[in-house]
């Protein structure tokens, strides 16, 4: 009996891990927004670690957003003087 229970448990874990890798765990919120601790909608996507809601997007797009936000912050500091 214990062996069957262990087998069922292992099978359940394998199925859950497989579905997570395939991107079946949905994003939270709408329009691709996701929590930084959630899997993205697509297995090729990542969650950008930026101010505000984490956005599910491609890794390259995260880098572009970081550069744009960095420039915006520089302009704000310059014009505040």
Curated annotation (Swiss-Prot):
Q: Which residues carry this modification: Leucine amide?
A: 69
Q: Which cysteines are joined by disulfide bonds?
A: 27-41, 34-48, 40-56, 47-62
Tissue spec: Expressed by the venom duct.
What is the protein name given in its UniProt record? Conotoxin Eb11.3
Localization terms from the record = Secreted
Origin species, per record, is Conus eburneus
Domains as described in the record: The cysteine framework is XI (C-C-CC-CC-C-C).
Its main localization is secreted
Determine if Secreted is one of this entry's keywords: yes
Which key words are in the record?
Answer: Amidation, Cleavage on pair of basic residues, Disulfide bond, Secreted, Signal, Toxin
Leader sequence segment: 1-23
Gene Ontology CC annotations of this record: extracellular region
Q: Name one GO molecular function term.
A: toxin activity
Which protein family is it in? Belongs to the conotoxin I2 superfamily.
Q: Which residues form the propeptide?
A: 73-81
